[in-house]
UniProtKB/Swiss-Prot annotation:
HAMAP family: Ribosomal_uL15
InterPro entries referenced in this protein's UniProt entry, alphabetically: Ribosomal_uL15 (IPR030878), Ribosomal_uL15/eL18 (IPR021131), Ribosomal_uL15/eL18_sf (IPR036227), Ribosomal_uL15_bac-type (IPR005749), Ribosomal_uL15_CS (IPR001196)
Signal peptide from the UniProt entry: none
Subunit relationships: Part of the 50S ribosomal subunit.
GO MF, one annotated term: structural constituent of ribosome
Entries under Pfam families matching the protein: Ribosomal_L27A (PF00828)
Protein name as annotated: Large ribosomal subunit protein uL15
Keywords from the UniProt entry: Ribonucleoprotein, Ribosomal protein, RNA-binding, rRNA-binding
Annotated region described as Disordered, given as residue ranges: 1-52
Organism of this sequence: Actinobacillus pleuropneumoniae serotype 7 (strain AP76)
Gene Ontology BP terms: translation
């Protein structure tokens, strides 16, 4: 077997549709587009969600919910993210330096998710009751 002797399996490749090549090809004249109408024209077609003039579904349904602006500058981090910080002191700046949070985050809350093995000192971050218990059980502490 050589590279120049390789070929696809029989029937694995279909030949391309050759449109507008005579009546007997089956794809001559209208080229598989049918007669007249918007979809037969060059550049013809309708946008996504268009229902022929009927009020489309996305406009029939009501709007709901909103995006809280708080979500743009408040982050929740897991216990196992605390281990990614160099040293044993975890602050907002040290989390940014370790790429755990983005630079536009202004406040952080540590939640009880994942595990923590090393003892860390958490400074100036929000901590849930469960996360506080887990940090203290690992030998760490929380400072406001």
């Amino acid at each position: 077997m050589r590279l120049n002797s390789l070929s696809p399996a029989e029937g694995a490749k279909h030949s391309a549709k050759r449109l507008g090549r005579g009546i007997s090809s089956g794809l001559g004249k209208t080229g598989g587009r049918g007669h007249k109408g918007q979809k037969s024209r060059t550049g013809g077609g309708v946008r996504r969600g268009f229902e022929g003039g009927q009020m489309p579904l996305y406009r029939r349904l009501p709007k709901f919910g909103f995006t809280s602006l708080k979500s743009f500058h408040v982050a929740e981090i897991r216990l196992n993210d605390l281990a990614k910080v160099d040293g044993n002191e975890v602050t907002l700046e040290s989390l940014k330096a370790a790429n755990v949070i983005t630079k536009d985050i202004l406040s952080v809350k540590v939640i009880l998710a994942g595990k923590i093995e090393k003892a860390v000192v958490v400074k100036g971050l929000g901590v849930t009751k469960g996360a506080k218990a887990a940090i203290e059980a690992a030998g760490g502490s929380i400072e406001e």
